[in-house]
């Protein structure tokens, strides 16, 4: 199911470029449609990399010309509670991943593909990208956690429009409603995703990234940031040398060398 071989035919492939891990959905002949086993694999990969201090950024992308055309329809015909559990597990693992996650979208990003993209922190697309949430075409109920994430990202009106109509939208509208954060021409998109991931992984404080992600997510969920969360990250800051290093690097006009690598708990 999982391999580090970039030439593999396995449906999930992980490649590494220093501190950047890339998770490839690798069924290009099926537009990277996701099977139950792939949902389970995504959860397992996220669990492994969440505590791997050599991994600073996770990029999710599709092999070939498409990101992900959604769930494998053949499996939906015989899906049961275990399929729903696998889907929920992947969504939770990706959405709660403590380090920055980037979805790199080209071509189809539909149904479960949109669910994966929304679970990531940042979505970068090229101009071939097409998005949709399409359960209304199939007569199925979209997962509640997927609806919840979509509403929090897009707002209720845009989410209802996508769910009610099952229409596919291009990058222009996706950018307008906040479904993607950046769009680039195909020739420039790969270079941009590499540069952005490298920036996050090598020149920015992981302490700032993880604390910001935790506080933003908590604020979205509950409407506030608890004192316990504030105290936790205050303690991490006090125990870290990153703040002193950041100030010194700024004054000395050099790139910072941040050393914080993960929470102490």
Which residues does each PLM region occupy?
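Conserved CoA-thioester-binding segment of acyl-CoA-metabolizing enzymes
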Residues: 1-63, 187
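Terminal low-complexity tails and localization/encapsulation signals of metabolic enzymes
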Residues: 1-9, 248-265
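Glycine- (often His-adjacent) and acidic-residue-rich active-site loop
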Residues: 54, 62-96, 109, 139
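A general structural signal for well-ordered alpha-helical segments in protein cores
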Residues: 73, 87, 147, 156-159, ...
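CoA-thioester-processing core
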Residues: 90, 94-96, 104, 110-163, ...
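Well-ordered beta-strand positions
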Residues: 122, 161, 165-167, 173, ...
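C-terminal long alpha-helix characteristic of the crotonase
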Residues: 124-129, 180-228, 241, 257-265
């Amino acid at each position: 199911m999982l391999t580090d071989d970039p030439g593999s035919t396995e449906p999930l492939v992980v490649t590494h470029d220093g501190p950047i891990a890339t998770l490839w959905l690798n069924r290009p002949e099926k537009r990277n449609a996701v099977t139950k086993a792939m949902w389970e694999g995504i959860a397992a990969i996220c669990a492994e990399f969440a505590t791997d201090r050599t991994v600073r950024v996770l990029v999710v992308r599709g092999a070939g010309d498409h990101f992900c055309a959604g769930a494998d329809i053949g499996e939906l015909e015989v899906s049961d509670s275990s399929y729903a559990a696998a889907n929920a597990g992947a969504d939770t693992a990706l959405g709660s991943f403590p380090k920055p996650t980037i979805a790199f979208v080209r071509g189809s990003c539909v149904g479960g593909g949109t669910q994966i993209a929304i679970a990531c922190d940042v979505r970068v697309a090229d101009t071939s990208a097409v998005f949709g949430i399409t359960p209304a075409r199939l007569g199925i109920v979209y997962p509640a956690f997927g609806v919840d994430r979509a509403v929090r990202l897009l707002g209720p009106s845009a989410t209802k429009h996508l769910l009610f109509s099952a229409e596919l939208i291009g990058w222009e509208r996706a950018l307008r409603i906040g479904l993607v954060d950046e769009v680039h021409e195909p020739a420039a998109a790969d270079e941009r995703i590499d540069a952005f991931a490298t920036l996050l992984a090598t020149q920015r404080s992981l302490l700032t990234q993880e604390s910001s992600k935790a506080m933003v997510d908590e604020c979205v969920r509950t409407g506030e940031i608890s004192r316990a969360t504030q105290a936790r990250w205050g303690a991490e800051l006090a125990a870290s040398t990153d703040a002193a290093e950041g100030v010194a690097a700024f004054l000395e006009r050099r790139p910072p060398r941040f050393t914080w690598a993960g929470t102490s708990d």
